[in-house]
Structures are given as structure tokens and as C-alpha cells.
Amino acid sequence: MGRRKSQAAAERNLEPIKISTDSIKKRPRRDSNEPPFKKFDDLEMFETYLKGESWDNDFDFLHARLDYYPPFIRNEIHDDPEKIKPTMNNKSKKFVRNLHHHVDKHLLKQINDMVGIEYKFKREEEKLPDGRLIWRYKDESDHGFEGLDRKWTVEVDVECSPNDPTVVVDMRSIPID
């Protein structure tokens, strides 16, 4: 991370964390089988939430949804939704290529950094009849915490539509009994 990026991350309190077996406690008692649902429209708030859940020891029991314009779109339109072009959607190969780069090189890496666990996501692609494109990233590994009763799966769905450049990221972390 460059000096300006690390300085900006420190100001936002988004420094990456690393979870070790020493920091993992016994699974907390929960009143529901479904994790609480949180919805965000800002990438930084989403990252802050993930970091907070890790600090609260709830990294294995969360459901968060992020609806946002990816950074490459925001940079092109200069944060002015009026400048969105009709070609800024998943019908454009350039949009899909840039989104794929953003997700693989930035979003999933930030999720790993904020949660403090190295997820090894495997991707499946699905194109729906209505034109929506969904990439399903899934991780079912045990993350090296043998001996602890904390096993979970993580699913991250990234969805984009043929109508606009909005990207929907749906992250679910579900404990396995």
C-alpha cells in the first residue's frame, strides 16, 4: 500500500487486521439461525462493518449487502450520476472486464483484509435470462482453526444488470454445525 493510501486508511480506521487462533473465542450464543441483515450503499461503510464484526467475534455470522457504483465508474462520472452513459452496464465488455478486475484485485482482497482471514474464493458465473450477470464466490475451507468449534462457509455474490452500472454485493457468512 502506498503512503497516501495507508494514510487515508488510517484516518478512516480501516487498517487490515489478522485473526489468529488466540483471538478466536468460543462461538457466542445466538438467538436466531439467520444472521442479522445489514444494507450499505458505500464501500467504506461496508468495509468498516466487516472489520467491526471481526472485532466483535461475529465473522462467522453475518449477512451484508452493498449496492454501489464501482470505483472505476465513479471516477469516470466524477461522482455525478447525470454523467452515466447508456453503455455503462454488463452489456459492455469493457465494463465487465473492469468489474472483474475490481472484484478480484480489490474487493475480495479488501474483504480478506478487513475480516482478517485469508478466504480462498472459488468463482462460478451465471448469466440469467433477464440479462443480469452474477458471479458467485464461495469459500468452504476451515481457515486453519482446527480444534476450535468455529467452522463456517462464506458466499459473496456480485451482481450487475444490463440497465445501469449499479453493482450489488451480497456477502453471507454462515456457521456450520
Curated annotation (Swiss-Prot):
Q: Please tell me one Gene Ontology term that the record gives under cellular component.
A: plasma membrane
- What family does the entry list? Belongs to the RGI1 family.
Q: Which Gene3D superfamilies match?
A: Respiratory growth induced protein 1 (3.40.1000.40)
What processes does the entry annotate via GO biological process terms? energy reserve metabolic process
The membrane topology of this protein is: Peripheral membrane protein
The primary location reported for this protein is membrane
What is this protein's record name?
Answer: Respiratory growth induced protein 1
- What is this protein's function per UniProt? Involved in the control of energetic metabolism and significantly contribute to cell fitness, especially under respiratory growth conditions.
Instruction: Note the superkingdom of the native organism.
Output: Eukaryota
Question: Is Repeat there in the keyword field?
Answer: no
Q: Does the keyword DNA repair apply?
A: no
Query: Record's Pfam families?
Result: RGI1
Question: What keywords tag this UniProt record?
Answer: Cell membrane, Membrane
Q: Where does the record place it? A: Cell membrane
Q: Where is this region: Disordered?
A: 1-37
